[in-house]
């Protein structure tokens, strides 16, 4: 297997599409469907990149990003429907490395 990717998004159809696409490129993909689960998985396993939704149940993506930054410098890409410049700035200030708006 190739790179290890953690996808954290509560929209199961989007997760399925991302997982399929990444696995076609020989990447190992783990998925979490809420912020708490995503944070737990990020603590338990070393990933090469985290794809993180902004609006998540239990803990939002900004909080997850901020907490991951306390123990890891893994690249984090925010994937979200919120495309305002202010949302992008907030994501980057909380530690994200890049920001992609849905749909992509």
Locations of regions flagged by a protein language model:
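N-terminal/domain-start alpha-helical segments
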Residues: 1-104
């Amino acid at each position: 297997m190739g790179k290890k990717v953690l996808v954290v998004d509560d929209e199961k159809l989007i997760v399925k599409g991302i997982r399929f696409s990444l696995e076609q490129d020989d990447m190992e993909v783990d998925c979490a469907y809420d912020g708490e689960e995503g944070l737990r998985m990020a603590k338990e396993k070393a990933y090469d990149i985290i794809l993180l939704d902004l609006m998540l149940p239990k803990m939002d993506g900004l909080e997850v990003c901020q907490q991951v930054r306390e123990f890891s410098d893994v690249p984090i890409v925010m994937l979200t429907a919120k495309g305002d410049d202010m949302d992008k700035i907030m994501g980057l200030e909380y530690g994200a490395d890049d920001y992609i708006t849905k749909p992509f």
